[in-house]
Curated annotation (Swiss-Prot):
Heterooctamer of four alpha and four beta subunits. It comes from the Bacteria. It holds the Pfam family Asp_decarbox. Belongs to the PanD family. It comes from Xanthomonas axonopodis pv. citri (strain 306). This is Aspartate 1-decarboxylase.
Length: 126
């Protein structure tokens, strides 16, 4: 059996552009792609924290260090500039691989620069 686990996440990034007439995708600062291990043209899930929208598209590389987080094409209809989003990618793996797998979690500041990284999420307490 194979499991689908969170491979990488960019947490609470700010949408910088919404380009309806650009070829569909999400353009992500190249430094964030490198930090997460998300590959160009890889499928990603977008969860808009601001409005609750959830959809998928594919990642393309934006200029390194630019802070760009641009939703393009049809995806642009689901967000507005200034919205907070989570970008997530998943990977399929065996149960044995899953036992030792750790996701790349990247947390950003208001300018979409990396504030810190982690490989686990703290346990939620009551």
């Amino acid at each position: 059996m194979h499991l689908s686990l969170l491979k990488a996440k960019i947490h609470r990034a700010t949408v910088t552009h919404s380009e309806l007439n650009y070829e569909g995708s999400i353009a992500i600062d190249g430094l964030l792609l490198e930090a997460t291990g998300i590959r160009e043209f890889e499928q990603v899930h977008i969860w808009d924290v601001t409005n609750g929208a959830r959809f998928s598209t594919y990642a393309i590389r934006a200029e390194d260090g630019s802070g760009i987080m641009s939703l393009n094409g049809g995806a642009a209809r689901h967000v507005q500039v200034g919205d907070l989003i989570i970008v997530a990618a998943f990977a399929s793996m065996s149960e044995d691989e899953a036992k030792t797998f750790k996701p790349n979690l990247v947390y950003v500041n208001a300018h979409n620069a990396i504030s810190h990284t982690n490989h686990s999420i703290p346990t939620q307490a009551a």
